[in-house]
C-alpha cells in the first residue's frame, strides 16, 4: 500500500502550486486560501492503465498551513505520512521502517504541496487548468513521477483528489466528514519514531 502513499508525497507540490493559466491559477489559489486547516476521512481507489482496480483503502487526512500535513491509511494495511513543517516522515508499521525527507526536498519531488505550500516559486513549477469545479494541475518538469493531479471542490470544500503517475495508474481520493482542526489535533503533525523502528534518513543535511 505504500506506493500510492509515496506518490502522494510526490504530489505534495501539485496540490499547493501552479501557473500558466493565470486566471485558473488565481482561482485555485483563492480556493486553497480558504483551506488553512482541515481534517477529513478519505477513501482511496487505485486503478491501472487498463482501468483494473489494484488497491483500495480508507483513512484520515489533515492539513494546516504552513507546511503541515497528515495522511494516515488505516485499511487494509496501515501506513502514515506526517509533515511537521520541517521534515516529512513516511512510516510503514509492517516493515518497521520510517523514511525522513526535508520538507522542501519532498515538495521538489512532487505535486500535493499546493495544499500546504503557498510560495510563488512552487506555483511557478506547475500549470493549472480549470474545468467546472475541478482544477487540473500539471508539473512543467517532464521527469515528474506524478504526471498530473486533479482537485475538485463542492460548496467550497475539497471533495476529490486524483493523481496520475508515469505508469498510467490513477489514484482517486474521496474526502468526507470534513471539519476545522481543534487544538487537540496539533499532535497529528508531530511524529515520534517508535522503538525498534529502522530510520532511513534521506534529509539533505543528513547526507552531508
Curated annotation (Swiss-Prot):
Protein's GO biological process: lipoprotein localization to outer membrane; lipoprotein transport
Source species, domain of life: Bacteria
Pfam family, one: LolA
Keyword Chaperone: yes
Keywords on record: Chaperone, Periplasm, Protein transport, Signal, Transport
Record localization: Periplasm
CC terms in the record's Gene Ontology section: outer membrane-bounded periplasmic space
Coiled coil: none
Signal peptide (from-to): 1-22
SUPFAM superfamilies reported in the protein's UniProt record: Prokaryotic lipoproteins and lipoprotein localization factors
Binding partners and assembly: Monomer.
Functional note: Participates in the translocation of lipoproteins from the inner membrane to the outer membrane. Only forms a complex with a lipoprotein if the residue after the N-terminal Cys is not an aspartate (The Asp acts as a targeting signal to indicate that the lipoprotein should stay in the inner membrane).
Name of this chain's protein: Outer-membrane lipoprotein carrier protein
Species assigned in the record: Shewanella loihica (strain ATCC BAA-1088 / PV-4)
The organism's taxonomic lineage, starting at the top: Bacteria, Pseudomonadati, Pseudomonadota, Gammaproteobacteria, Alteromonadales
Name of the gene this protein is made from: lolA
Amino acid at each position: 500500500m505504500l506506493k500510492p502513499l509515496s506518490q502522494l508525497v510526490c504530489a505534495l507540490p501539485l496540490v499547493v502550486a501552479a501557473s500558466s493559466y493565470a486566471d485558473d491559477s488565481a482561482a485555485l489559489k483563492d480556493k486553497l486560501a480558504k483551506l488553512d486547516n482541515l481534517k477529513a476521512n478519505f477513501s482511496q481507489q487505485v486503478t491501472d492503465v487498463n482501468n483494473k482496480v489494484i488497491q483500495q483503502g480508507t483513512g484520515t487526512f489533515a492539513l494546516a498551513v504552513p507546511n503541515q500535513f497528515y495522511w494516515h491509511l488505516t485499511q487494509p494495511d496501515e501506513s502514515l505520512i506526517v509533515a511537521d513543517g520541517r521534515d516529512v516522515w513516511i512510516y510503514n508499521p509492517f516493515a518497521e521502517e520510517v523514511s525522513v525527507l526535508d520538507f522542501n526536498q519532498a515538495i521538489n519531488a512532487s505535486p500535493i504541496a499546493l495544499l500546504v505550500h503557498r510560495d510563488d516559486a512552487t506555483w511557478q513549477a506547475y500549470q493549472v487548468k480549470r474545468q467546472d469545479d475541478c482544477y487540473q494541475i500539471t508539473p512543467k518538469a517532464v521527469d515528474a513521477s506524478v504526471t498530473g493531479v486533479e482537485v475538485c471542490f463542492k460548496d467550497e470544500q475539497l471533495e476529490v483528489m486524483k493523481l496520475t503517475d508515469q505508469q498510467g495508474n490513477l489514484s482517486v481520493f474521496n474526502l468526507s466528514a470534513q471539519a476545522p482542526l481543534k487544538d487537540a489535533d496539533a499532535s497529528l503533525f508531530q511524529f515520534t519514531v517508535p522503538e525498534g523502528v529502522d530510520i532511513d534518513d534521506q534529509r539533505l543535511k543528513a547526507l552531508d
